[in-house]
Amino acid sequence: MKIGSFEINEPVPQLDKPIVVAMLKPWIDVGRVGTLTLSKIEQSVDAKELGRLDRPGMFFDFTRYRPRIKITDGIRTFITPNSEIKYGKDDQSGQDYIFLHLREPHSMSEDYIDSIISVVEHFSVSEYYRVGGMYDTVPHSRPLLVTGTLNPQKTELVGDLISSGSPSYQGPTSIVNLVAESLEQSSIDCSSLMVH
């Protein structure tokens, strides 16, 4: 089944108001914070592949994201860089999750963003979280700094985990930030957590 530019595996699972946890390579995956966070949560909910881009070459320059060759049991496999979607359910709470392993697009960014939003809308997502890490001048002798944007209820829950105050960053950013901006306009609760 196609949703935007994503090919979704069939049979398509019935998910009840899933929460999306997204990460973005390579821009905000410093120290593999996003990759490791998603991996840990995916293991705890026994995540399975839901889909991936049908034609990743529409969005990615394969001279920048290099394809790889892998040999398993003497068989060579060609692996094309892609954006992947996984899903899982927390058995204790019954909460469904969707995990977005996104890559920074090199072309047709607007179509890429529209495809991500289409997936989120198709599955009636209740919340969208983006997690990652970014370079910063933080001394090794101090605890890591976590910044982000959370609604007031969530800010109260995390207490001193994240630095208080309004975001003040100005400068280069990712086109993928438009995902959260668009989802907020659709009244989907969006949060971001970045480790520095």
Regions found by a protein language model. Give the residues of each.
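N-terminal short beta-loop-beta anion/metal-coordinating cradle
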Residues: M1-L102
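Flexible, glycine/proline-enriched loop segments at strand-loop-helix junctions
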Residues: L24-I28, L100-S109, L161-Q170
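Conserved active-site and cofactor/substrate-binding residues in soluble primary-metabolism enzymes
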Residues: D29-L36, S107, D111, Q170, ...
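Acidic/glycine-enriched edge-of-secondary-structure segments
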Residues: R64-I75, G132, I162-Q170
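Internal, conserved structured core segments that host functional sites
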Residues: Q95, L102-T155, V179
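Catalytic cores of processing enzymes, dominated by hydrolases/peptidases
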Residues: T137-H196
